[in-house]
Amino acid sequence: MKKILSLVAVLSLCILLTGCGKVLKCSSSSEQKNYNISTDYKIESSGKIVTKVTIKQVIESKDKKVLQNFKKQLEDQYKSNNTVYGGYSYKVKINGKKLTANITIDYKKFDLDKFVKANGAMKEYVNKDNKLTVDGAKKMYKSTGATCK
């Protein structure tokens, strides 16, 4: 279960940092003993700056408790992130043996300055004005095992 939480934390952090012009798509997947996770990221940008990211995360498990735990953790995290940094909209639902989370982060509303200040390691992915760059988002996602096109 700790592996689950670690993976969710990393993916959620990535979700925070990614965020109209060009579109970059990244995806990742992970198979664990009790569940499988697949995540698709659609990163929209204006020039070299990320403006919006849309994430679809699907978690499949035969164990309803695993899905219910994921649902609670994800909803709590997204609600907290939206309260602290703004810019989040999300919907998490369970249908049978599948949990689907649809998340959008609008970087025009997201307080990236505050986020970078609270998460110093993120300076690696932003420019000098604390704007998330497309190259930074790509580097960040790749560091978590995602592939980007």
Regions found by a protein language model. Give the residues of each.
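Subset-of-secretome marker
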Residues: 22-149
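Sec-dependent N-terminal signal peptides of Gram-positive bacterial secreted proteins and lipoproteins
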Residues: 1-22
